[in-house]
Amino acid sequence: MSSAIINGKEIGQEIRNAVAERVIRLKEQGLTPGLAVVLVGDNQASATYVRNKQKSCEAIGMYSELIKLPEETKQEELLTQIQQLNQREDIHGILVQLPLPKHIDEDTVIATIAVEKDVDGFSPVSVGKMMLGQETFLPCTPFGVMKLLEYSGIEIAGKHAVIVGRSHIVGKPMGQLLLQKDATVTYTHSKTPDLPSFTKQADILIAAVGRANFITKEHVKEGAVVIDVGINRDDNNKLCGDVNFAEVDGIASHITPVPGGVGPMTITMLLFNTVQAAENKLAN
């Protein structure tokens, strides 16, 4: 029997519809949520992501602005640009598209974003608050995964969640959010010996390793929930995840496809966070 598909497009659309309602209510009070996206250089993948983000904003009635800077932009110039956005009343969320050119320090740039506009949830203050379980903007991909689990009716409390990957953007925050919902969490990564001996214990397996079809049937126990965060190209240049879907389908109880699983949720939660930032502004 095939695994149940967790459909990120459908769940994402349901959340977007609710967010669009919130945008209407804000506009009735004279406030249009605004997102500024800063893109440095000519990375084609980044440019595509940014276009998708802008389209998604416009689709729900939000304002979005692209600040496109050349590859050779100095770090000081970028920081000045962010400080100007921090001051602007019409911008409620600021997102700096990563990766940045090598000569720019990402940590310094992210730390410059005003915490009340840090809709990516990457700044040291946002991360610290998340670790403490305080209210803050959550990183969009892990936040999206939590929503997928919630909307699919998957129990987290008391379950063993194993995460493959330890990036600041997905792996580390993912574990924290699961821990806050009373999962027992194990982190694994590229240096973990005998990876299947860990992943085979997972009730919920999160693959966020950035390697095409890396997780096979050897890694998954019968009935596990498998969440595939990866977006890769295989040898035939076909879009695929970190999980070998064909092998794991039928072993997992639930699985996210690539595309159409976690991907749509990342942008959805960015919209969610930006509208939340606008609502916070109005409340204050």
Curated annotation (Swiss-Prot):
Cellular component terms (Gene Ontology): cytosol
UniProt KW keywords: Amino-acid biosynthesis, Histidine biosynthesis, Hydrolase, Methionine biosynthesis, Multifunctional enzyme, NADP, One-carbon metabolism, Oxidoreductase, Purine biosynthesis
A Gene Ontology BP annotation from the UniProt entry: L-histidine biosynthetic process
Enzyme Commission number(s) of this protein: 1.5.1.5, 3.5.4.9
Protein name: Bifunctional protein FolD
Source taxonomy: Bacteria, Bacillati, Bacillota, Bacilli, Bacillales
Membrane spanning residue stretches: none
Subunit structure, as described in the record: Homodimer.
Catalytic activity: (6R)-5,10-methylene-5,6,7,8-tetrahydrofolate + NADP(+) = (6R)-5,10-methenyltetrahydrofolate + NADPH; (6R)-5,10-methenyltetrahydrofolate + H2O = (6R)-10-formyltetrahydrofolate + H(+)
Pathway linked to the protein: One-carbon metabolism; tetrahydrofolate interconversion
Pfam families: THF_DHG_CYH, THF_DHG_CYH_C
InterPro entries (UniProt xref): Aminoacid_DH-like_N_sf, NAD(P)-bd_dom_sf, THF_DH/CycHdrlase, THF_DH/CycHdrlase_cat_dom, THF_DH/CycHdrlase_CS, THF_DH/CycHdrlase_NAD-bd_dom
Domain of life: Bacteria
Provenance organism: Lysinibacillus sphaericus (strain C3-41)
PROSITE patterns: THF_DHG_CYH_2
GO terms of molecular function: methenyltetrahydrofolate cyclohydrolase activity; methylenetetrahydrofolate dehydrogenase (NADP+) activity
Function: Catalyzes the oxidation of 5,10-methylenetetrahydrofolate to 5,10-methenyltetrahydrofolate and then the hydrolysis of 5,10-methenyltetrahydrofolate to 10-formyltetrahydrofolate.
Family per similarity comment: Belongs to the tetrahydrofolate dehydrogenase/cyclohydrolase family.
Binding site for NADP(+): 165-167, 190, 231
